[in-house]
Swiss-Prot record:
Taxonomic lineage: Bacteria, Bacillati, Actinomycetota, Actinomycetes, Kitasatosporales
UniProt source species: Streptomyces lividans
A GO CC term assigned to this protein in UniProt: plasma membrane
InterPro entries attached to this UniProt entry: SecE_bac, SecE_sf, Translocase_SecE/Sec61-g
Subunit and interaction comment: Component of the Sec protein translocase complex. Heterotrimer consisting of SecY, SecE and SecG subunits. The heterotrimers can form oligomers, although 1 heterotrimer is thought to be able to translocate proteins. Interacts with the ribosome. Interacts with SecDF, and other proteins may be involved. Interacts with SecA.
Membrane association type: Single-pass membrane protein
Name of the protein described by the UniProt record: Protein translocase subunit SecE
Record gene name: secE
Domain of life: Bacteria
């Protein structure tokens, strides 16, 4: 194999292990009951929500104002483009 930048390392034939020596995927993780998996999922959600950095009230007001102004500008832009296309269509098709 060449070690060029961006090349993919492909396994050679002698690198592959026979099927009898491969370990099973899943292991003990697949043996948990549905309630334990649901509890684990819930604990992971709570842990992730605790990591969230919530904006302050001032930041939230600023972000909301910026989004509303941007949406109003985009509505105006689309309205102008639509108005232009409608007049162009009336001019072309009579």
């Amino acid at each position: 194999m060449t070690d060029a930048v961006g090349s993919i390392d492909m396994p050679d034939a002698q690198d592959e292990a026979p099927d009898s020596k491969k370990s099973r995927k899943g292991g003990k993780r697949g043996k948990k009951g549905p309630l334990k998996r649901l509890a684990l999922f819930y604990r992971q959600i709570v842990a992730d929500v605790r990591k969230v950095v919530w904006p302050s009230r001032n930041q939230l007001t600023t972000y909301t104002t910026v989004v509303i102004i941007f949406v109003v500008i985009m509505i105006g832009l689309v309205t102008l483009i639509d108005y232009g296309f409608s007049h162009a269509a009336k001019y072309v098709f009579g």
